[in-house]
Amino acid sequence: MWMRFRPSLLVGALALVVTLSLVLAAGWPGRDAYRYLNVFQEVWNLTRENYVEPVSEDDLLEGAYRGMVASLDAASAFLAPGEEVGVLEPAGPGRAGFELLPSGNVAVIVRVDPGSPAAEAGLHRGDQVWRIGGEPTRLKSWPQLRRAVTGPVGARLDLVVLDGRRYRLRELSLELAAPADGGFLIDRPREGLIRLRITEPDRVEGASLADALRAEMARAPATSVLVDLRGAVGLDVERAGAIAAALGSAGPGFRLVPRSGPERRIDVPDLPSIQLPDARFVLVDGTTAGSAEALAALLRERDAARLCGRDTFGLGALPELIPLSRGGFLLLTTRQVVTAQGTSWADDGLAVDRRLETRVARGDDDGDPLLDAALDWIAAGAPEQPATGRTASGTGEPAGVESRS
């Protein structure tokens, strides 16, 4: 039964101990390193000899491996043989209509698309997904989670979810559907303002976005543009560059910087120019991650866009699969993404230019207070005010989402 947690808690505790032991050992030369490794050995021996139930050594070691790598960031993981299949390949066409981010080793829903299967099933931001297709989500990286919740159109997606409002477990089954948009939506929440909401940055085609923006500008004039990147997560920084191009940027975009070896440069492609308003703003929070953070950083540097809302998640490196000699793989971030000017958001995220204060929202039924605050600020002329600093968790709404750094 999935309700039985004692062995998994034991593995998690041991994973924490070995993670701390190995990390501390790596930071101390010579004899001092053994002091930290001895902690692991002592816990290992005490567990094997005294735990009330029989303990599988293989399970303990695998839990330690998973905990150690998962503690690095939201895109790194230890993968047992077979788990690597398709993990870095493009997601399937079917979608349930929600986005996940790992937070404190738990998968948290950070966006639910209106009219989607997820919305019809009553899922909300802040809900925790405990199991996907019978598999626990604990210690899963974002690429693994993305792969698990996408697939062929019409496929069933079985979930065990902790309702973030009522704190009760739900078992539900969704049918994956073809997305109704191209990874973005355009609307006008206030007169004279165009909001571009990026839902899936890794699905956006730059040329299609440029055509849609051009048509919107031809329909009615606008004095400002708000790019809404909340709940947007991805790892394709080339797509981020294409989105920036659709908004009028061009030239150097990003650099992929490995720990050693040559860098790779990613330029923003040239697209036909669009006469967009000069007043540009980007709405972000702690659910803005990966390629969405790359886009926000580029728009601030290249187009003088002002970031508002809450500080971002801090997923600023790209993973690759590294085979292990005895089987399995490491999914490990090996290249940090920085802008042409050297801006990085790995671990700490991007600090906003204007932090927006809102009332505490209980959920989607209470509207969108952060968007309302952004619209009011823009309507007031976007007055200057230094950001008040990062939040206690370094993140924004929904509550409970934090970076894995």
Model-based region annotation:
Residues A91-R131, E135-L139, R203-G206, R335-Q336:
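PDZ/PDZ-like domain segments forming the peptide/carboxylate-binding groove
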Residues M1-F5:
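Short, Lys/Arg-rich N-terminal segment immediately upstream of the first membrane anchor
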Residues V129-W130, L157, L330, W345:
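Generic structural signal for buried aliphatic residues
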Residues Y36-R48:
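Mature N-terminal segment immediately following signal peptide/propeptide cleavage
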Residues G363-A387, A392-G394:
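Low-complexity, Gly/Ser/Thr/Pro-rich intrinsically disordered linker/tail segments
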Residues S8-A25:
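Hydrophobic membrane-insertion alpha-helices, especially the h-region
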Residues A26-G27, R31-Y36, S56, V110, ...:
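Cleft-lining beta-strand/loop regions that shape enzyme active-site pockets
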Residues E49-V108, P143, G154-D158, L162-I186, ...:
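Extended, small/polar residue-biased N-terminal targeting/export presequences
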